[in-house]
Amino acid sequence: MPFDPAFLWQTFVALLSGIPLALQLAVFSVALGTVLAFGLALMRVSRLWWLDLPARFYIFAFRGTPLLVQIYIIYYGLSQFPDVRHSFIWPFLRDAYWCAMAALALNTAAYTAEIMRGGLLSVPAGQIEAAKACGMGRVKLFRRIVIPQAIRQMLPGYSNEVILMVKSTSLASTITIMEITGIAAKLISESYRTVEVFSCAGAIYLILNFIVARLFTLLEWALWPERRNNRLTTDPVDRKGELHA
């Protein structure tokens, strides 16, 4: 098949219309998933078995099954139950958009909860004991000592999870959501030019995730001033040392 720059450009422009919907799914599902993940992480570190076990089961279930299966269960499976169809949540569950968002949020919550748990457990026990010795209450200790350090530790893993969620929005096309991949599938059915269309879609996802990665790099730069200072001071010292040598 001959190379056709005009077709590639037209395809790229057509796929751009799917970006807002893809970003909506990614942003809202990550936000909802983060809230749920925080609760799950607290349950995991609570040292109370009746809180820890349900959180463990939830995380195991959603990490151990494919996201596509979860989307199908929510969109196709729940509608099989009459009680669900007559409940107040049915107006949402019969809409593919909300089903996709729910599946994405529930899935990312399981992964993010473990990232948060690792961040919470990374805070040195000595600092916690010192804060208690200074008379800090549990809430103040958590807010002033634990949370700031946990955020910095979990940020690299969390950024990877956000990037994965941006890519995972492509699975929403399997339940008729016309985001980037959904529009790509429609264009392929009309033109039969699979390679060109999916190459354009892949380029758009690559650009989006590059932007997300850079935003998290800037956030890490802002939250980790000692790394910034080390980077600014290390190079001049090394060059000076080489001159004296």
Swiss-Prot record:
- Record GO biological process: amino acid transport
GO cellular component terms, alphabetically, are: ATP-binding cassette (ABC) transporter complex
Question: How does the entry describe its membrane topology?
Answer: Multi-pass membrane protein
The protein's location, in the record's own words, is: Cell inner membrane
Per its record, what triggers expression of this gene product? By octopine.
Which GO molecular function entries does the Swiss-Prot or TrEMBL record give? Answer: transmembrane transporter activity
Entries under CDD domains matching the protein: TM_PBP2 (cd06261)
What residue ranges are annotated as transmembrane? 12-32, 57-77, 96-116, 163-183, 204-224
Listed A to Z, the keywords are: Cell inner membrane, Cell membrane, Membrane, Plasmid, Transmembrane, Transmembrane helix, Transport
Tell me which domain of life the UniProt entry assigns to the organism this sequence originates from.
Bacteria
Q: What biological function has been recorded for the protein in this entry?
A: Component of the octopine active transport system probably consisting of four subunits: Q, M, P and T.
Q: Which NCBIfam families match?
A: HEQRo_perm_3TM (TIGR01726)
* Protein family (similarity comment): Belongs to the binding-protein-dependent transport system permease family. HisMQ subfamily.
In its UniProt entry, what is this protein called? Octopine transport system permease protein OccM
Instruction: Please report the organism this UniProt entry assigns to the protein.
Output: Rhizobium radiobacter
